Amino acid sequence: MPTVNTSLMSDRDHNRQKVYALDTCFWGGSIRETERFCVPVSFEVWTEYAEMLFTDGLRRPYHDQIRRTRRTPSLRIDRLVLRPDETCTVSAYAYLRSDRLEVSEQRLLLWLALHEVAHLLVPACLSAPHYWRWMSVYAQMMQRHVGAYAAGQFLAVAECFRIKYRRNATPTG
């Protein structure tokens, strides 16, 4: 199992714990640890799904917020555990970040893809990666790929969690 380099994970990202808690609450999962989950899902299915979201986001960027980089942004997907039923535990890394996110149930698969791909579409902010612009892009992706009602509901719950997602919000949230 690959180790997680926590050197890029900032303690100043006050939104991080709240966002992960919001994700699990909104998608109906259960928190075992704040950032680690496991999912039995076909590796090929997950790869295809994540690549579809990522490609769609790059072709029609959300508010033209594409991370500017000389290298092509990528979503690194690792096969960690292959089971006899051809499912596996999947781990995803956003480009230039070392946060590892895994999900506990198949219905959380969409959340994992949306969450990580949103990191690839917004400018890097390693000190506070879950700042207002990321939340805005995340909500737009949810509106496109899940539905307007879901996006509105998500942002309403985000307000209850005191997560700032508007332009006048500070990166520390």
Predicted regions and their residues:
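Active-site recognition of the HExxH zinc-binding catalytic motif
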Residues: 111-124
